[in-house]
Amino acid sequence: MSDVALKRNSSFFRAKARLTLLKRRDGGVISRSLEHRRSSRRRSSVSAPTRRVSGTLAKLGADDRRQFFDAFFRMTAVSPEETVSLLRSMTVPVIQQENISLPYDINAKFAPGDCISLSEMGYTLEMGGCCSLCSYGWSTTTPPELPALELAFMHHLSSVVEFKELVTSLRVCAGNSIVGNGAYENEGLLRMIKHLLEQSTLFYAYYTVKGGVSHDFRVLISEDGGGDGGSPAYAMYFVFKPGSPLHLGAKLIRQLIFNCPGYKWHADVHEGAFLLVVTRDRCSAIPEPRRVKLDPEDVYRRYCDVLVTEEKVHDYSRLYSTFSTYCPPASRREQTAAPATAKQV
């Protein structure tokens, strides 16, 4: 062995012996501090640029971040090899939770794969692929696809099997029966059914939510301005149990958006209860689909024959009273914009 190699080995062993002695004498305090400084230097040298970038992204809004990542992935898609090497070197995940506020416009801020979690601890938006609730199916079942939905809609709307909750709500909204002996007759219900059949998308919305959410909910109907041809337009509220958390899965949100063209969806909270609100989008040029042809008289007769308990009627009467002052988010926005427009004129 050469003299240089011997010197290096002897220096190494002397340093090692010195370090061992320091460990024994000081209880490893010095060695831990040295190791801490080394690890902190490694972290600062490796991840400082990453921290700067992630900090900048955190300051951006949701729309700006979406545009940034859209341009970023378009650029990296040009070269798959560089994309793979870049992803391997990343230390900060691209996907993360995002806090939102209510009311939340689902249509305007929807991106495929988004899911929404609402609870008393806060409201968050995240990717369904990274969401444990979506992965394990904790809060949602798989909603039906559109072809199956159309067939089920036509069948169940006539047979009232899946629409009993909605029937109860419609009867309470229309008013008390004009006949006695336990039977139900009300011309107001017939008028509501005629107008609602012109908004068949609301029935699609009800069936989609019922098939895609495992949480119990109540459904309310409310007039929301004028519709086509001077007939009243209706909004539908899906009210969930007060104080209970709500998770809207990525698959469900996708179905709500694509099964209901020309309608707007909002997540909101009222009197401690989370709710989904679906209203006609007055700015949309998409006409109401006319795929389903049902006789209003036939549907009315079937709805009148449904047995509704007094307890259920009382629950819905109380709920309608609670929401008598509630204004849908879309209407609130229009009311806020109207004075501003008037001032400009």
Swiss-Prot record:
<dbReference type="InterPro" id="IPR021152">
    <property type="entry name" value="Herpes_UL31"/>
</dbReference>
<protein>
    <recommendedName>
        <fullName>Nuclear egress protein 1</fullName>
    </recommendedName>
</protein>
<feature type="zinc finger region" description="CCCH-type">
    <location>
        <begin position="115"/>
        <end position="247"/>
    </location>
</feature>
<dbReference type="Pfam" id="PF02718">
    <property type="entry name" value="Herpes_UL31"/>
</dbReference>
<dbReference type="GO" id="GO:0008270">
    <property type="term" value="F:zinc ion binding"/>
</dbReference>
<keyword id="KW-0479">Metal-binding</keyword>
<comment type="function">
    <text>Plays an essential role in virion nuclear egress, the first step of virion release from infected cell. Within the host nucleus, NEC1 interacts with the newly formed capsid through the vertexes and directs it to the inner nuclear membrane by associating with NEC2. Induces the budding of the capsid at the inner nuclear membrane as well as its envelopment into the perinuclear space.</text>
</comment>
<keyword id="KW-1048">Host nucleus</keyword>
<keyword id="KW-1043">Host membrane</keyword>
<keyword id="KW-0863">Zinc-finger</keyword>
<dbReference type="GO" id="GO:0044201">
    <property type="term" value="C:host cell nuclear inner membrane"/>
</dbReference>
<dbReference type="GO" id="GO:0016020">
    <property type="term" value="C:membrane"/>
</dbReference>
<keyword id="KW-0472">Membrane</keyword>
<keyword id="KW-0597">Phosphoprotein</keyword>
<dbReference type="GO" id="GO:0046765">
    <property type="term" value="P:viral budding from nuclear membrane"/>
</dbReference>
<comment type="subunit">
    <text>Forms a heterohexameric complex with NEC2. Interacts with capsid vertex specific component 2/CVC2; this interaction directs the capsid to the host inner nuclear membrane to initiate budding.</text>
</comment>
<keyword id="KW-0862">Zinc</keyword>
<comment type="similarity">
    <text>Belongs to the herpesviridae NEC1 protein family.</text>
</comment>
